[in-house]
């Protein structure tokens, strides 16, 4: 069996009902992959600590990429910070001073990004930041809006993992559902967009499934079975 590394989003991918509740059958299937000798690494817009804790309790590989690539957690007190929180906070202040309904989302503490409620026009916000010469990334994970440092995304974050653990692109399988997962798709040879993904996201994946979220992960793993059986 050839070892593969699965880079898996959390919200909208292994959750159900939109509230962050884990789809247990999907998690069980991911744990089974680990038991078979593969790696399963969560790559999320949530904090890397949340992703790491899910890996501990869920029985997957104990590494996580969080904050849309801005932070990597390798252990309880071992974090690699790739983003700059202060420049994200500065962007937040600019938006608050120039737009209405810009509100932070109540989330677990972040080390490299700012997380916002999805209560304002994203394109208008990007225009305001550009006019003020603020160079950050403003993205929509469907879970929230995120302000990240320039050059930070799930793809760059996971690339650090690939370098650290000598993982080949040919052995990476990415699974996700939102625009923030597209950079992750680009660093993986195989990528799967779930049924709840937009058409734009689906067009960036090498494979799509019809089922949504956790059910989509189960469908994806069924489709990937021939690849996983390769020697």
UniProtKB/Swiss-Prot annotation:
**Record's function text:** Catalyzes the dephosphorylation of 2-phosphoglycolate.
Which CDD domains does the annotation name?
A: HAD_Pase
Q: Which domain of life is it from?
A: Archaea
Per UniProt, where does substrate bind?
154
Q: Name one Pfam family in it.
A: Hydrolase_3
Could you tell me which species this protein originates from?
A: Nitrosopumilus maritimus (strain SCM1)
* Bridged cysteine pairs (disulfide): none
List the cofactors.
Mg(2+)
Q: Which GO terms describe its cellular component?
A: cytosol
Tell me which InterPro entries the record gives.
HAD-like_sf, HAD-SF_hydro_IIB, HAD_sf, PGPase
Q: Where does Mg(2+) bind?
A: 9, 11, 177, 181
> Which family is it part of?
Belongs to the archaeal SPP-like hydrolase family.
State a single Gene Ontology molecular function: phosphatase activity
Give the residues annotated as active site: 9
Could you tell me what reaction this enzyme catalyses? 2-phosphoglycolate + H2O = glycolate + phosphate
EC number assigned by the record = 3.1.3.18
UniProt cross-references to HAMAP family, sorted A to Z: GPH_hydrolase_arch (MF_01419)
Can you name this protein? Phosphoglycolate phosphatase
| UniProt keyword terms in alphabetical order | Carbohydrate metabolism, Hydrolase, Magnesium, Metal-binding
């Amino acid at each position: 069996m050839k070892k593969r590394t699965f880079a898996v989003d959390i919200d909208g991918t292994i959750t159900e009902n939109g509230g962050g509740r884990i789809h247990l059958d999907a998690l069980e299937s991911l744990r089974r992959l680990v038991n078979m000798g593969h790696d399963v690494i969560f790559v999320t817009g949530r904090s890397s600590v949340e992703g790491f804790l899910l890996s501990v309790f869920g029985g997957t590989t104990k590494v996580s990429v969080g904050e849309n690539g801005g932070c990597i957690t390798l252990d309880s007190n071992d974090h690699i910070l790739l983003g700059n929180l202060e420049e994200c906070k500065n962007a937040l202040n600019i938006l608050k001073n120039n737009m209405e309904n810009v509100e932070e989302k109540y989330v677990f503490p972040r080390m490299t990004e700012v997380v916002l409620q999805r209560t304002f026009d994203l394109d208008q916000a990007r225009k305001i930041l550009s006019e003020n010469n603020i160079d950050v990334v403003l993205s929509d994970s469907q879970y929230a809006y995120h302000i990240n440092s320039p050059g930070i995304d799930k793809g760059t974050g996971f690339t650090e993992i690939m370098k650290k653990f000598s993982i080949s692109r040919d052995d990476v399988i990415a699974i996700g559902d939102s625009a923030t997962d597209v950079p992750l798709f680009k660093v993986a040879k195989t990528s799967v967009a779930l049924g709840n993904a937009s058409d734009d996201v689906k067009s960036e994946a090498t494979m799509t499934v019809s089922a949504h979220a956790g059910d989509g992960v189960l469908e994806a793993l069924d489709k990937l079975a021939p690849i996983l059986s390769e020697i």
